[in-house]
Design a protein with these regions (language model features):
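Polar/charged side chains located within well-ordered beta-strands of beta-rich proteins
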Residues: 16, 33, 53, 68, ...
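Glycine-rich beta-solenoid repeat tracts in large extracellular/virion proteins
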Residues: 42-46, 60-77, 95-105, 123-129, ...
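N-terminal extracellular ligand-recognition/capping segment immediately after the signal peptide
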Residues: 21, 28-70, 88-92, 114-116, ...
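Acidic Gly/Asp/Thr-rich repetitive segments characteristic of extracellular carbohydrate-active
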Residues: 5-33
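Leucine-rich solenoid repeat scaffolds
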Residues: 309, 313-345
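Leucine-rich repeat
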Residues: 77-79, 108, 219-221
Length: 345
């Protein structure tokens, strides 16, 4: 069963953080119960096999709240972290313009019933090169002012490259080898940001070597979520070869003049060499209510290969640009578009 600790705040923010980190470090199985509102000065650094039960208590940090520093480019480098509950926020009312929870090279991660506040320029949760992650019944909400051109997401699903993960690059260049995420599930969540949820891709130029088939995310599931984008897409899944988005309310408030940023739900391969176009790679978008600008749902490949199977079924989809622009699927090997309601918004 491991050790169980009931944490009591012991003084100032730095002392609280040090004491919690002493309880959380190491690989043995442990449960930390946070039974009070607490103030910390910077990130908590849990070890493997850690459960944090924060209930309805508020954890306020002068920086971010959860981070791990990987020592090897392996999904199993950090494992078995569960966070239950908690209202996690920065001490500034406009939130942290950075990442609140950054988890990298990790597997078997579970974040449940947590509320995370972050500035529009930041990320509530950033998953870099992770496998087998569940984010369930969480609220991720941006704070402060959102610029008209902000494209940062509250939930970021990332690969490890020098530009996508500069924090890892500072730790070790070996950590930035382009490892993608796989088996990521987001369910029963409410997410609002400049972007809501984004699966990221590496930039052009020097980063082109991270735009290969091996760098593509896979098995991303978004289910029963309410996701809103204020100045970019509500959901944008780039370089993701297999995904399921179902039973979600997806709304982009971005004006249609922002073109592709105003799409409600976007799935796109970016320029580069993509995975082989096989019907086994399925993009399934079903039973969602989607509101967008230029398009509601937009699926396409700008890469060397087509997408695999694309299913768009049972959705109610609106586009500010008109009914005929509600759903657009381009460049897929097999396409099934059925039983959708489309309208002008």
């Amino acid at each position: 069963t491991g050790s169980v600790y009931n944490f009591v705040p012991i003084g100032n923010a730095a002392d609280n953080r040090r004491a919690l980190n002493l309880l959380m470090e190491g690989n043995e199985k442990k449960v930390i119960n946070i039974n009070n509102n607490i103030h910390i000065d910077t990130y908590l650094r849990p070890g493997n096999n850690t459960t944090i039960n924060a209930g309805k208590h508020t954890i306020t940090s002068d920086k971010g709240v959860i981070i791990n520093d990987p020592t090897a480019a392996s999904y199993t480098n950090f494992k078995n972290l569960t966070i239950n509950g908690g209202i996690w926020k920065n001490s500034s009312s406009s939130g942290l313009a950075g990442t609140m929870m950054r988890i990298s090279y990790a597997s078997n991660i579970s974040i449940n019933n947590a509320t995370v506040y972050t500035n529009y320029k930041g990320h509530g949760i950033e998953l870099i090169s992770c496998s087998n992650v569940v984010v369930n019944n969480c609220t991720l909400k941006a704070q402060g002012k959102c610029s008209k051109t902000c494209v940062e997401e509250q939930l970021q699903i990332d690969l490890s490259s020098p530009t996508t993960a500069p924090g890892l690059y500072r730790l070790s260049k070996k950590l930035c080898n382009g490892t993608p995420c796989k088996n990521i599930t987001v369910k029963n969540c409410t997410i609002q940001g400049a972007r809501g949820i984004c699966a990221n891709f590496a930039g052009a130029g020097n980063e082109a070597k991270y735009r290969k088939a091996r760098n593509y995310h896979s098995n991303i599931t978004i289910e029963n979520c309410n996701v809103t984008g204020i100045s970019a897409e509500a959901i944008a899944l780039f370089n993701t070869k297999s995904t399921t988005v179902k039973n979600c309310r997806i709304t982009t408030k971005t004006p249609k003049s922002r073109n592709s940023y105003s799409v409600g739900l976007a799935v796109a391969y970016q320029k580069g060499s993509a995975p082989k176009a096989t019907t086994k790679n399925v993009i399934s978008l079903t039973n969602n209510t989607v509101k967008g600008g230029q398009q509601g749902i937009f699926v396409r490949s700008n890469a060397s290969k087509k997408l695999g199977t694309v299913i768009v079924s049972g959705n109610t989809v609106s586009a500010k640009k008109g009914k005929k622009n509600a759903i657009k699927v381009l460049s897929a090997k097999k396409v099934k578009i059925t039983k959708n309601k489309t309208k002008k918004w």
